[in-house]
């Protein structure tokens, strides 16, 4: 919600594309990782986040729209890299909100893994669709706090380990 409010205000801010980078500048060295969770759009907050980022972990929903949106994101990232942030890289692709029913999600997952193998890292960890994630968000807490012993929480912990181990 906070990012949505910021998105409405960013165009009015002088130098809006560098505003997040400027904001994070003084605190960047205090953290190993700073996560900026953007909405699935290519609006001004997402672009400003790309300008501020060192690398991007890209969640991909294994369905047509999720796959189709990747090309637009990669094109936007290429423009940001050329003009505003030469060091921007892809940390990896994360298959997320994976449905356990039907063959289509598994087929899309295979497509994603095959299409980007050798191009970008596709994390081994897959995050399954779970009601606990939106419920945790609605309660303003992490999924770890909200649903400590649930499968989806264990998947997020596995992703964390995978990111930390592979840097």
Question: Which stretches of residues belong to each language-model region?
Answer:
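Conserved catalytic-core segment of NTP-binding enzymes
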Residues: 23, 28-128
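P-loop/Walker-type NTP enzyme "switch/lid" segment
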Residues: 1-29, 84, 136-138
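Short, polar/flexible loop-turn hinges at active-site or ligand-entry regions and domain interfaces
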Residues: 7-10, 60, 145-147
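Short, glycine-rich, amphipathic interfacial segments at transmembrane boundaries or analogous
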Residues: 129-136
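Charged catalytic carboxylate motif
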Residues: 19, 72, 155
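C-terminal boundary of histidine-terminating zinc-finger modules
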Residues: 136-155
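C-terminal alpha-helix
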Residues: 158-167
């Amino acid at each position: 919600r906070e990012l949505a409010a910021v998105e409405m205000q960013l165009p009015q801010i002088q130098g809006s594309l560098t505003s997040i980078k400027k904001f994070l500048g003084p605190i960047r060295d205090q953290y190993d990782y700073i996560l900026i969770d953007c909405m699935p759009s290519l609006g001004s907050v997402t672009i400003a986040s790309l300008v501020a980022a060192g690398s991007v972990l890209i969640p991909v929903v294994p369905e047509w729209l999720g796959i189709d949106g990747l090309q637009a994101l990669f094109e936007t990232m290429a423009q940001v890299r050329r003009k505003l942030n030469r060091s921007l890289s892809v940390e990896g692709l994360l298959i997320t909100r994976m449905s356990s029913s039907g063959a289509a999600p598994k087929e899309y997952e295979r497509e994603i893994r095959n299409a980007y193998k050798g191009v970008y890292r596709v994390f081994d960890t897959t995050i399954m669709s779970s009601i606990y994630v939106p419920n945790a968000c609605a309660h303003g807490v992490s999924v770890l706090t909200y649903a400590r012993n649930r499968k989806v929480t264990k998947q997020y912990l596995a992703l964390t380990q995978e990111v930390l181990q592979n840097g």
